[in-house]
């Protein structure tokens, strides 16, 4: 009987010590970086992205098929074109801390999962997306990688808006000359 009592007491002690482990220490820049990510998305939704959120050596990582990386100027131009021809709204967004892939420690980077509702003319498409941003010591966004089928979604919106597609094609042809 004493053996059983001792075993129960030992088990209870183990459970208490396991439950008493301290909270996971958050990277002190994480909350500031989440605010920067949200500000970038707010700017996209309001059609006015603040370039000061981004480092001068910013890279928008090309994650699509044969998509090249874009620097800050090219990314700002791309986003300006997109916000000119469509409205976007991020819903059901979840923000999570990222980790250093070598040390597996929290590094201040931010991941997000969400659904983008994109509207062009009368057409609307919804798109599930995942993305990750890394930041420099000044708190500026250093890189942004996002994963979703943006090309198919944009193509579906253009298919329902042939007049916008024609204008974009004319602009592309003028730029190529």
For each of these PLM feature ranges, what is it?
Residues 48-108:
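A solvent-exposed, acidic/Ser-Thr-rich amphipathic alpha-helical stretch
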């Amino acid at each position: 009987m004493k053996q059983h009592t001792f075993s129960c007491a030992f088990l209870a002690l183990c459970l208490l010590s396991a439950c008493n482990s301290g909270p996971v220490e958050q990277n002190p820049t994480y909350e500031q970086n989440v605010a920067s990510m949200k500000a970038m998305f707010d700017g996209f939704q309001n059609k006015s992205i603040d370039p000061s959120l981004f480092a001068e050596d910013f890279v928008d990582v090309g994650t699509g098929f044969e998509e090249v990386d874009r620097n800050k100027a090219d990314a700002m131009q791309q986003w300006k074109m997109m916000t000119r021809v469509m409205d976007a709204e991020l819903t059901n967004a979840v923000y999570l801390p990222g980790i250093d892939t070598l040390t597996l420690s929290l590094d201040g980077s931010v991941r997000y999962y969400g659904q983008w509702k994109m509207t062009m003319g009368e057409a609307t498409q919804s798109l599930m997306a995942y993305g990750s941003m890394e930041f420099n010591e000044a708190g500026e966004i250093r890189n942004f990688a996002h994963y979703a089928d943006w090309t198919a979604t944009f193509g579906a919106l253009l298919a329902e808006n042939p007049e916008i597609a024609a204008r974009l094609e004319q602009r592309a042809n003028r730029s190529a000359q």
